[in-house]
């Protein structure tokens, strides 16, 4: 049975097994116990999935990311602690040392600082331009 949009908003992709909570519970743990070093090694080597430290992910965040991807029709999502963390992840995935980026000069001051200070330290040059310029004027 296909889920409607409202059902997806509430339940996402969470499918409880018999005897499990109807709604995905919030996991309030920072660390996870494993009885076998090989299990942990497989997690670190990305050979298996699971949680080992909440700063890197946990079942609650995994569920949120899957939920957002489902609602957006995407294949995955990344949730971050802040918009600035999201901005940095985006920039580091499209630019590398020696690259030149053009940005509007009419952006959030924190993003301006990220672009003009942090990215500069990483060897990524950002040029700020008037957002009302025509494409031909940028050349």
Predicted segments, located by residue:
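Conserved PLP-anchoring active-site segment centered on the Schiff-base-forming lysine
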Residues: 93-111, 130
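Hydrophobic alpha-helical segments in the ANL/AMP-binding
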Residues: 89-92, 110-118
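Well-ordered alpha/beta subsegment
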Residues: 73-74, 100, 136
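Alpha-helix C-terminal capping segments
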Residues: 70-71, 89-97
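N-terminal glycine-rich, Lys/His-bearing helix-loop that initiates the first secondary-structure elements
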Residues: 1-48
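Conserved N-terminal alpha-helix of the aminotransferase class I/II PLP-enzyme fold
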Residues: 36-85, 113-117
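PLP-dependent aminotransferase-class I/II
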Residues: 113-139
């Amino acid at each position: 049975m296909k889920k409607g949009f409202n059902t997806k908003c509430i339940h996402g992709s969470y499918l409880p097994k018999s005897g499990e909570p109807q709604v995905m519970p919030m996991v309030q743990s920072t660390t996870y116990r494993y009885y076998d070093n090989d299990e942990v090694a497989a997690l670190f080597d990305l050979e298996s999935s699971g949680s080992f430290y909440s700063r890197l992910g946990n079942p609650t965040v995994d569920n949120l990311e899957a939920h957002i991807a489902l609602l957006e029709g995407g294949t995955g999502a990344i949730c971050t602690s802040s918009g600035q963390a999201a901005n940095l992840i985006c920039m580091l995935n499209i630019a590398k040392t020696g690259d030149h980026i053009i940005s509007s000069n009419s952006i959030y001051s924190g993003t301006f600082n990220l672009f003009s200070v942090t990215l500069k330290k990483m060897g990524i040059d950002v040029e700020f331009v008037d957002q009302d310029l025509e494409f031909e004027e940028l050349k």
